[in-house]
């Protein structure tokens, strides 16, 4: 599995390249592997998909649940993954910074 810094560099290169790219939203580890096998070059989590896997509506999951979902997707693929972290799961800058710190681990 590529290191986080390698995935970040790959993701940055996709954005710097001419043209555009499609970034699909897997909802679980299996769909992440399928999308990778289909040739997509990056993936993105979806707060709606994450909530749906728990039987809830978008916006109705906790920070810990969102981070666990992101961790599952990241662990299932070698591709870079962009995370949908809603509003950062906090009402203060410190709370949002903590969410992003935890996500980067």
Question: What function would you assign to each model-found segment?
Answer:
Residues 68-72, 98-105:
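Alpha-helical scaffolding segments of alpha/beta enzyme cores, especially the outer helices
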Residues 42-67, 87-92:
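Glycine-rich, proline-tolerant flexible connector loops at the mouths of alpha/beta enzymes
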Residues 22-28, 43-45, 81-85:
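Hydrophobic faces of well-ordered beta-strands that scaffold small-molecule active sites
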Residues 6-10, 17, 56-83:
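Alpha-helix-loop-beta-strand connector modules within alpha/beta enzyme cores
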Residues 1-25, 29-38:
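N-terminal amphipathic alpha-helix/helix-capping segment at the start of soluble metabolic enzymes
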Residues 31-37, 89-101:
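Catalytic cores of alpha/beta
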Residues 28, 35, 73, 84, ...:
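Conserved, mostly hydrophobic/aromatic
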